[in-house]
Amino acid sequence: MSKQTLILLYGGRSAEREVSVLSAESVMRAVDYNAFEVKTYFITQSGDFIKTQEFIETPGDDEKLMTNDTVEASQAIKPSDIYEEDAVVFPVLHGPMGEDGSIQGFLETLKLPYVGTNVLSSSVAMDKIMTKRILEVAGVPQVAYTVYIEGEDLEAAVAETLEKLTFPVFVKPANMGSSVGISKAENESELRSAIDLALKYDSRILIEQGVVAREIEVGILGNTTVKTTDPGEVVKDVAFYDYQAKYIDNKITMDIPARVPVEVMTQMRAYAAKAFRALGGCGLARCDFFLTEDGAIYLNELNTMPGFTQWSMYPLLWENMGLSYSDLIKELVVLGQEMFDKRESHLI
């Protein structure tokens, strides 16, 4: 039986490129090499595409994907050269220029099927402010928030925040993930500093009400038929689950399934599916919730390309549901091909 080519895109231009490499290395090891051969392409911080490695069998434990320190400039290619007939692309890219619709539009232009959400849902879900506004209309509960857009009246935005919210608040770039650029502010001075930091990453800033809550996550899989997982909980040894805690210090553990009442679990799964559909999602996503001591549920964000390492929440949630990492990848490829065929059929 001939194998299908699975193209892994990794690295990328965003501040989350290191997470992308970790995720891609996990995927390359988990792939069923009876069904796939894998070709990998590294995207540099400057946006160059580098042809890196090919695998026809499971790589050894010491095999690493080539990155900035090991890629060869002579292997740079035109981005369109990744095209291969009957291949499927897995864009294991996080953050801007990865899960914001940019790469998805590029792949659709090349007529390549790909894993994950489409152009519209990727771009909308990447922007925390747009997500908030759409989910408000959909009736999905969220914490109170204000917005600052660079070029608008900063003093007015600070005044609105002081009027509508209470400290602590969290200040977030609208279009970053993995907690990059996010700060907790306990007073007005810290709020202003947090806005300055967030502006280094984005011109659109979200300011959210801080809540004392457990962080619960639900996995989503599907296109027109949407499946969800039992929730898992992020258990932190730090006050704030930032990039350092997530990926460098490993100061978190995961409780899967989360120890929550059945009715809370059911409601979270329903909200996750509702949010996914409201944003036009397809393929996969991870929906992150806050659960307060008094039982209030707030949707925090919907991540269209969640961390995909072997220790990441998303694949572990599906493993708990009986779907192995390897079979999850197969299912995602099938869903990606299904959406490609549907897009092509609509071009009449």
Curated annotation (Swiss-Prot):
Q: Where does Mg(2+) 1 bind?
A: D288, E301
Q: Which residues form a coiled coil?
A: none
Which positions in this protein are listed as binding ATP?
162-217
Q: What class of enzyme is it?
A: ligase
The record's free-text note on cofactor binding: Binds 2 magnesium or manganese ions per subunit.
- Mind telling me which InterPro entries this protein's record contains? ATP-grasp, ATP_grasp_subdomain_1, D-Ala_lig_Van_CS, D_ala_D_ala, Dala_Dala_lig_C, Dala_Dala_lig_N, PreATP-grasp_dom_sf
Main location per the UniProt record = cytoplasm
Tell me the SUPFAM superfamilies matching this sequence: Glutathione synthetase ATP-binding domain-like, PreATP-grasp domain
The record's catalysed reaction(s) read:
2 D-alanine + ATP = D-alanyl-D-alanine + ADP + phosphate + H(+)
In which compartments does the protein localize? Cytoplasm
Q: In which pathway does it act?
A: Cell wall biogenesis; peptidoglycan biosynthesis
Domain ATP-grasp residues, every copy: 132-334
By its UniProt entry, which PROSITE patterns does this protein fall under?
A: ATP_GRASP (PS50975), DALA_DALA_LIGASE_1 (PS00843), DALA_DALA_LIGASE_2 (PS00844)
Provide the alphabetized UniProt keywords.
Answer: ATP-binding, Cell shape, Cell wall biogenesis/degradation, Cytoplasm, Ligase, Magnesium, Manganese, Metal-binding, Nucleotide-binding, Peptidoglycan synthesis
Q: Provide the Gene Ontology terms for cellular component.
A: cytosol
Cofactor(s) it depends on:
Mg(2+); Mn(2+)
Family statement:
Belongs to the D-alanine--D-alanine ligase family.
What PANTHER family does this protein's entry cite? D-ALANINE--D-ALANINE LIGASE (PTHR23132), D-ALANINE--D-ALANINE LIGASE A (PTHR23132:SF25)
Q: What is the official name of this protein in its record?
A: D-alanine--D-alanine ligase
Q: What organism does the UniProt record list as the source?
A: Streptococcus thermophilus (strain ATCC BAA-250 / LMG 18311)
